[in-house]
Amino acid sequence: MIEFELTDEQRLIRETAGEFSDRELAPRARENDRNEHFDTELVQKMAEMGFLGAIVPEEYGGRGVDYLTYGLIVEEVGRNDSAMRTVISVVTSLVCSSIVRWGTEEHKQEWLPQLCSGEALGCFGLTEPDTGSDAANLKTRAEKIDGGWRLNGGKMWISLGNYSKLAMIFAQTDPEKKHKGLACFLVPTDSSGFSSQEIHGKLGLKGSDTAELSLDGVEVPDGALMGEVGDGFKIAMSALDSGRYSVAAGCVGICQASLDASVAYAKERTQFDRPIASFQLVQEMLADMVVQTQAARGLVWRAGWLKDTGKPNTTETSIAKLYATEAAVDCANKAIQVHGGSGYVDDYPVERYLRDARVTTLYEGTSQIQKLIIARSVTGINALVP
């Protein structure tokens, strides 16, 4: 029999994360968004709650929860503050999960306790100014030198890049080998030749740090290589698989927040001597949001369950990411419609929900990339390979 009930422990963790989100994140979200302020105090508080190392084994300083439980935490954080949810997605899903799976014991001992405790943040250096979805054609180069590697290149749209102590840098060792020449390096950001620059003027996630990274002759030892030369593409894809799950879970939070705000406003706002919640077309929008929220949550839970049981889940994770991100955009847009003119200003949070949701259809694989992954599973044809 299929079981749709959470365990007592999962319900408790979800409730605790929700209370934290309401108490700590919600009161600051608007001002941090207005001021483009990356709130490091909130980051530290999330670390103290165990959010940054939620899926990391306890022996390395993490909480050791399963993916379904992790998704519950991410949803509750995303319900109030997508900028802070981004911190969890990057540190936990992209960086920590990669080190757990691909790192040496030395990598794990050196970095995981720092990342879980918030002593250090990490960033994921894959995207470049001229390379987004086409990860096999990176321009950043890794040149073998005596005892190590020399890195040259640049990375773009890197979340947490200005605040990270550790950067996962993907570089090409041999352009003729395409994806088989990619390598992944763990690079301390205080390395000579490493620099970052803030990116401002974003539509959403204004409370999240975003950077452009430059690597000008950055030298790292052989021990900085994660996996083997040629493993970089596999490392990137496995990290993105984990990251897509957390983005989807966070978008369920946006859907729920949009629904909650809309129901509250529609029951309070009166026109023609009655609450607008009684109008059939408003109820239609609310009903659509209920369906989208529950459907997105169900897809995320299924992807999490597959991850926890060790079953193949790449397609299901892409399905969850595609549906939940598009649903978040639509639910937030409907929430603005329910709020009318009030939804167009930041006195209410729904306009921020829409701005924050929009980027989720772009990063960690665009909606179009997710559709290609999903279609590949039924056709057996990779649309990205000539």
Mark where each language-model region is.
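A short core secondary-structure module
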Residues: 148, 152-196
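Short Gly/Pro-enriched turn/cap motifs at secondary-structure boundaries
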Residues: 115, 130-133, 157-160, 174-176, ...
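Flexible, glycine-rich active-site loops centered on histidine and acidic residues
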Residues: 96-102, 124, 176
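Short Ser/Thr-interspersed hydrophobic loop/turn segments at strand-loop and sheet-helix junctions
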Residues: 50, 74-78, 171, 187-192, ...
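Short glycine/proline-enriched turns and hinge-like loops at secondary-structure junctions
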Residues: 65, 134-136, 160-165, 178-181, ...
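Flexible, small-/acidic-enriched active-site or ligand-binding loops
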Residues: 137, 190-219
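Alpha-helical interface subdomain recognition
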Residues: 1-90, 102-107, 114-119, 132-135, ...
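A short, Trp-centered hydrophobic/proline-enriched beta-strand micro-motif
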Residues: 118-126
